[in-house]
Amino acid sequence: MAKVIIIGGGVAGMSAAHELIERGFEVDIYESNPEYVGGKARSVNVPGTNQLHPDKFLPGEHGFRFFPGFYRHVTDTMQRIPLSGKNGKNSGKKVFSNLVPTRAVMVARYGLPSIIVNAGLPNTGVNMKQQLKGLKGSVDTGLTKEEKKFFLERMLQLATSCRVRRDNDYEKIGWWEFMHADEFSATYRSLIVVGLTRTLVAANAKSASTKTGGSIVLQLIYCGLQPWVNTDRVLNGPTNDVWLNPWKEYLTRKGVQYMHDAHAVQINLKDHLIDNVTIKTNLSNPEKARDIDVNGDYYIFACPIERMAELVSDELIENDLCFQYLKELAPSVAWMNGIQFYLNQNIEINQGHIIFSDSEWALTAISQVQFWGDYDLDMRFNGKVKGVLSVDISDWLSTKYKDVLAEECRADEVADYVWEQIEKSLNVDGKIIVERSMIEFYYLDRDIHWDDKIKRNIDKEPLLVNSINSWGLRPTASTDIDNMFLAADYVRTNTDLATMEGANEAARRAVNCIIDAEGNKSSYAQIFEFNDPWFFDVMKWWDRRRYDKGLPYSSKFPWWVKGVSILMGLFFVIDGIFKYLFYKLRITGEAGYIILSMVVTLGFAALDAWKGWGTWSAFALSIGMFIALSIYAFRLQDRFLKKLLLFGLVVGLVELLADNWLVNGIRVLVYPSDEPFLWASPMYMPIAWAVVLIQVGYLGYLISKSRGLVVGSVATFIIGLIFIPVFEFAAKYAGWWEYIPTKNMFMHTPYFIILGEGLICMILPFIFVKEWRLKWWYSILFGLFVGFWIFLSYFTAYNITG
């Protein structure tokens, strides 16, 4: 199998190695850090804090890790990293299980009460009470009605703009300009405009691209509106302990070679291909440092933009102009580095992240120990540390505090001034939440290096920011050098943000390019799209028509576009209700969805029998369930369920023959006369039959898969004898239909109907097992057969029971 050299052992490099090694490639990683993996995601052992035990250090970090609900690439990888137990053996769990949800987001302001909101919609009774309590005594944000209205209008514009407009027009507009920051109050700018960009992407609001900033804000909003999504997740311990070290162990156990303390210094080309890469080893020990040439079939460069720019030569640019653009992109970086305060009290402050919206240096923080379970701090440093407040500083270069920029301050001054901004934000109205006496120690990220010559700091690991018009400078994962690929957060991705998620996605794209180049038959690494609500799709389609005509965005949609969007919105709500029930009942997959729909159907019928809502409710239930099943089938491209829906519709239409015989032939079935009819049946009846047969038949299908067709058929026969008569009983008292009373009845249902419906259900497992494998047109054929089988079953049962 081909050998792949990966330059850079951060999240991008490790993600690429993960996908490659699982597909049988040989993988070598070269990482500049002499000890740690994971790049900027790493945690560290704070030097000199192992005073009480040689192996117990205080945990420090470049910056705290944050896993929003819209992250899908990196979390998918985490679900494939095994987690060892305390005995060193596989625990059966995955690293993903070390993610825990936060509960609230706090916005702390100078001299004003903090704003605290749930991190998403409440998903428990306790969270609901907290949310209602917060709304009842809610803190005034200081935003006017006009500002709130304008913010919502801007979000709606982003949500309903077509993809091309976002990629082209909004890439050229700064967030400041798009949000009309100059026209509103300082509070609006602080909370909505500047606060969001500085704390989320460490970017200046005036230069940050609306395409990127707007998309990320929308994703956070969408996550917050879905109670089954954990909007904000953190790790349950220091990053190395609970994620990166298990990841490295897994990769090396699979065969990845991981070389530390080494980085690339030159890319050597021959015949428009990389011949080899010159690596400098022993970086931390100059006396032992030496250059070596490493060879592979393919090369992935997973180093950050500033390092990659140093490797760009004139020869590279001659082969692919994208490398010239990389050099132009390299200055588009900002600083987002952390400082940790180790406190002699475990103060939670907030059950999640804290945004210091008025802080000059754009501070965000989280009190970490509350999420770390049984992590022991007692034997670390001086034994007095009880809590860790991890703070990210996102504005080092542009805004002054006490007339100085953060980059102009030595480490002690940075710590002092950051703490002052925290105190000003939290200690409000005479309440003392934090005070300096709590601090036992602090650790400033070692990437912040004080340079005595220039009397200011240097950041050794800055962060790429998505400034206006930077998308055009960013390369794809492939290059015109056929064995060279790029995997870093500056690569064009759906995520479009310098994050762990963007790095992981870029790595997957690079791996897919290698799979293509190698002609490998392995499956592609999965690429995820953003989860935009699909009920906006019609509005986006309309906006695309306007865009193609050269017209600007307009929120004045035609009435029919609004109407279709409202209808799709109703379907979206139904889908959301089902997802929430899945979340609460811990149901997953196709089987869970169909079984849950069966439970909801029975529950609704029972409630209707009690309340007697009448014929409209039967129509609503039938159509609603069919829509819910259709949404699931088409959203997840569930081919089997799509075929079952087609099968059910055909059965329902042919069943009208049997219904006519029951109504007009032997005259035992009576429907209310005040509803629209299709032949002798209510208009909804074909849909109702489709839903019920899918539900009952699927149960038989599941039983047949595990116990065999004979057992499945008998079980489905019994289910039909029980489920459908109960449904018939509910139908009578709900006012949907009823049977003419006779002596041969059980629960208001004639014996022959019960027997007939058992016979109907009995053959469904045979059909479903066959249909799973066969082509589409068999769904129609089977539907016709079962439709006639329904009539035959009733007719036979009628003659048997008299």
Regions found by a protein language model. Give the residues of each.
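Dinucleotide-binding Rossmann-like beta1-alpha1 core, especially the glycine-rich loop
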Residues: 51-150
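Active-site-proximal substrate-binding core of FAD-dependent oxidoreductases
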Residues: 513-568
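Active-site/ligand-binding neighborhood in enzyme catalytic cores
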Residues: 150-273, 282-283
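C-terminal segments that line or cap access tunnels to active or ligand-binding sites in enzymes
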Residues: 224-235, 296-298, 303-474, 480-505, ...
